[in-house]
From Swiss-Prot:
Protein name per the record: Superkiller complex protein 8
Family: Belongs to the SKI8 family.
Provenance organism: Dictyostelium discoideum
Pfam (any one): WD40
Residue ranges of WD repeats: 11-48, 54-93, 96-135, 138-177, 180-219, 223-263, 266-299
Length: 299
């Protein structure tokens, strides 16, 4: 079971849309142009480290590479910004196109970066040079979310038609198609072993799928009463966290038993994103109420 921990009110001046936790660094961004980093360890847990203000519109997605060397931020202004976290300086600016950057994520530790636009274009860039290396031809042109498998072998996208499409990173070939929901899919993630895909949709359901099976549906998790905005799996493979829109809930699930472990309704507005700590013992959530909430495994 988890318990409610620290709360930071007014963490941003506007709603917070995205959060990532890697090493001792938590990063947040949202409706405003600013991206902030925070301490992830005690005794300075959730105290502000650095503010980056390089976008001219809201920040829709961000990621920190596994070695916590780089922070990548994707904005509605059509740019991806890469920051060097050792010097807290701008490393590269990438033009991601006129429709903006919907989701981003690092590949192969910190060598490459994946960007997905609202039109469904999947692009892979060099982190070192900022140059586009290649594109993956995606047939889903109404994408709402994207996930990269932890083994760096697949990129999954999903959107308005309720379908998940999985692509092989190296070849760009589509390797699976999952008819996951009858309504738009808002959130998507892989299990830590890359064998299961979790989807969250506008039907308030979370569904588990085996992308390598001819009958991919495994089970459904029911606990929300509104759109599922975010899904994140813990690195130890035990837990799945989900957040809702109107219901404002943060739910933590036991993956093995498929039972609800903990549920919180602490935010005052819809809860956009979640991030587990690297050791899977803590969770943070961000919301349109401009706050960051933390939750910790009971000792």
């Amino acid at each position: 079971m988890f318990q409610f921990g620290k709360k930071i009110t007014g963490a941003h001046e506007d709603g917070i849309w995205c959060v990532k936790w890697q090493g001792d660094i938590i990063a947040t961004g949202g409706m405003g142009t600013k991206v902030k980093t925070w301490h992830g360890n005690q005794p300075q847990f959730l105290t502000e480290r650095k503010v980056f203000d390089k976008h001219i519109l809201g920040v829709t997605s961000l990621d920190i590479d596994i070695g916590a060397r780089y922070l990548a931020t994707g904005g509605m202004d059509g740019t991806v910004r890469l920051f060097d976290l050792s010097t807290n300086t701008l490393h590269k600016t990438i033009d991601s196109g006129p429709l903006g950057c919907l989701k981003i994520g690092f590949l192969n530790s910190a060598n490459n970066l994946v960007s997905v636009s609202e039109s469904g274009n999947i692009s892979i860039y060099s982190v070192e040079t900022g140059e586009k290396l290649r594109s993956i031809s995606n047939t889903n042109k109404q994408v709402l979310t994207m996930a990269i498998s932890p083994n760096n072998e697949q990129i999954a996208v999903a959107g308005l038609d309720g379908t998940v499409l999985c692509y092989d990173v190296e070849s760009g070939r589509r390797v699976s198609e999952i008819k996951a929901h009858g309504v738009p899919i808002r959130s998507l993630c892989f299990s830590s072993d890359s064998k299961t895909i979790f989807t969250g949709a506008e039907d308030s359901q979370i569904r588990l799928h085996d992308p390598n099976s001819s009958n991919p549906y495994i089970a459904s998790l029911l606990g929300h009463s509104s759109f599922i905005f975010s899904l994140v799996a813990s690195s130890n493979g035990d837990l799945l966290a989900s957040s809702g829109s109107i219901d404002r809930k943060v739910c933590i699930w036991d993956i093995k038993t498929r039972k609800l472990d903990s549920s919180f309704t602490a935010h005052a507005d819809q809860t956009w994103d979640l991030a587990f700590s690297p050791d899977s013992t803590k969770l943070v959530s961000v919301s349109d109420d401009c706050s960051i909430h933390s939750y910790a495994l009971k000792q």
